[in-house]
UniProtKB/Swiss-Prot annotation:
Alphabetic keyword roster: Amino-acid biosynthesis, Arginine biosynthesis, Cytoplasm, NADP, Oxidoreductase
Function in brief: Catalyzes the NADPH-dependent reduction of N-acetyl-5-glutamyl phosphate to yield N-acetyl-L-glutamate 5-semialdehyde.
Catalytic activity field: N-acetyl-L-glutamate 5-semialdehyde + phosphate + NADP(+) = N-acetyl-L-glutamyl 5-phosphate + NADPH + H(+)
Residues the record marks as active site: C149
Gene that specifies this protein: argC
Location in or out of the cell: Cytoplasm
Protein name (Swiss-Prot/TrEMBL): N-acetyl-gamma-glutamyl-phosphate reductase
GO MF term set: N-acetyl-gamma-glutamyl-phosphate reductase activity; NAD binding; NADP+ binding
Keyword NADP: yes
GO cellular component, one term: cytoplasm
EC primary class: oxidoreductase
Length: 348
């Protein structure tokens, strides 16, 4: 049994961590922090956790957090980096759900996130926590940068095509739509029920900060000597609470030498406990992954032409955030990778 701490426990990813860790056979959550709610019992703020979590929120204290075996940061971007240098010296292992350590190019991160990085020397020590790619490095990592929600769905959808150099890396397109919880638990007019209900819109078309993260991940798996992957990424807002549906497009390099794409995807993910390649012709639905740590994928080649279409769905709060964070923790501590995550999706 290990002790876990959560920094930033009042957001949606924080409460999702609590929901999943409450039933984890190897983990005891010993501290959860919130400056705004310090002293308030967790179950009073989140009644779904009554009878499962008997903790009160506390002020962040590095000395207390340093007594944990692992600490999850479920904080806004820019917060974790300020505590990280001191906390890492305690020997505590860290899973950061924010974007602070995802992008290795610090000036690029600063450009997209609009702030100076508070711990640039630690960026190179972070392991990007996409288990389907970096499982071996995650095992020994002291600091894991948990991928974003859009990057998770997009990279898992594209990986088999990019790894095998089957498509033009300069002509990748991702149209991805997320539920409103992807914007976080904060008051925003654009996210009010009356604003998003019965509507559907794109946003961030000029540039979304998940773009450099996705491109970095795709470039990491490209064969040597191949032109760097370039992605056109257009996010959309869905009038649902949770879920991401990514529709991905890629252009084949040689239409005369194309392997069976269904078999390619099935073989690539055959041993991945949280990636489900659907039978040929089936379409994934966001509701099929709600509350679960699963990514469901379908692959198509319409009219047998030069375009490959991949459909990828995840729950943005689970496989896109807290579930994947726990998956990383399981790998780091040698637990069964599915421990605490063997959850059936909610229907209806």
């Amino acid at each position: 049994m290990i002790k876990a701490g959560i920094v930033g426990g009042t957001g949606y990813t924080g409460v999702e961590l609590l929901r999943l860790l409450a039933k984890h056979p190897q983990v005891e959550v010993s501290v959860i922090t919130s400056r705004a709610e310090a002293g308030v019992k967790v179950a009073d703020l989140f009644p779904n956790l009554r009878g499962h979590v008997d903790l009160a929120f506390t002020e962040p204290d590095v000395n207390i957090l340093g007594q944990c075996d692992v600490v999850f940061f479920a904080t806004p971007h820019g917060v974790a980096q300020n505590m990280m240098p001191v906390l890492m010296k305690t020997g505590t292992r860290i899973v950061d759900l924010s974007a602070d350590f995802r992008i290795r190019d610090v000036p690029l991160w600063e450009k997209w996130y609009g702030q100076t990085h508070g711990a640039p020397d630690l960026v190179s020590q972070a392991v990007y926590g996409l288990p389907e790619v970096n499982r071996d490095a995650i095992r020994s990592a002291k600091l894991v940068a948990c991928p974003g929600c859009y990057p998770t769905a997009t990279q898992l959808g594209f990986l088999p095509l990019i790894e095998n150099n089957l498509v033009d890396p300069s002509r990748l397109i991702a149209n991805a739509a997320s539920g409103a919880s992807g914007a976080g638990r904060q008051a925003k007019i654009d996210n009010l029920l009356m604003e998003i209900s019965d509507s559907f819109k794109a946003y961030g078309v000029k540039g979304h900060r998940h773009l450099p993260e996705i491109e970095q991940g795709l470039r990491d798996v490209q064969p040597a000597g191949v032109a760097a992957a370039q992605l056109t990424f257009v996010p959309h807002l869905l009038p649902i609470i949770r879920g991401i549906h990514a529709t991905l497009y890629a252009t084949l390099l040689d239409v005369n030498q194309v392997p069976d794409l269904q078999s390619l995807y099935q073989q690539r993910y055959a041993n991945e406990p949280f990636v489900d390649v659907l039978p040929a012709g089936e379409m994934p639905q966001t509701r099929s992954v709600k509350g679960s740590n699963v990514c469901r994928i379908s692959v198509f080649r319409p009219q047998a032409r030069d375009t490959v279409v991949v459909l990828s769905v995840i729950d943005n709060l689970t496989k896109g955030a807290s579930g994947q964070a726990i998956q990383n923790m399981n790998i780091m501590f040698g637990f069964d990778e599915t421990a605490g995550l063997d959850v059936v999706a909610l229907l209806p």
